[in-house]
Amino acid sequence: MSDTLLSRCLAKNIRMTSQRQIIIQVIEESDDHPDVDQLYLRSVELDNTISIATVYRTVKLLEEAGLIERLEFGDGRSRYEEAGEHHEHLVDIETGEVHEFYNEELETLKAEIAREMGYDLIDHRLELYGKKRKN
């Protein structure tokens, strides 16, 4: 079985209903960082019997299982993405668009800072906020 969000749910013995499968599909197909309202709107396009409460419960279940991560970008909305490869976020403060990036030098620097302060780095989050430069 390929490594999909659905397969990881099944590996954790999460009971799979047709509505959960649709919500999971919507998360997997998202190329942005949707909030619950966006997940709901996308899910009801595929199955109009899905309630917003079902989306909230499913998101909570997946988050508690460590399969998705909650992101806060200072706009009052919790957004979600699949848990996976580590990366950082750059948020455009004018459009709200979120760009993912990874920088090995930055990773090394963060670990070095923790080490200099007498810590082993276990986890971290870094969010950058900016405005697109006009040429």
Model regions and ranges:
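Short, Lys/Arg-enriched N-terminal segment that forms or immediately precedes the first helix
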Residues: 1-13
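Pre-recognition alpha-helix immediately N-terminal to the DNA-recognition helix
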Residues: 21-26
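DNA-recognition alpha helix
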Residues: 37-47
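Short helix-capping/hinge SLiMs at alpha-helix to coil transitions
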Residues: 14, 28-31, 45-46
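Non-DNA-binding regulatory cores of transcription-related proteins
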Residues: 64-135
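Short helix-coil-helix linker/hinge
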Residues: 16-18
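Basic amphipathic alpha-helical segments that dock to polyanions
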Residues: 55-65
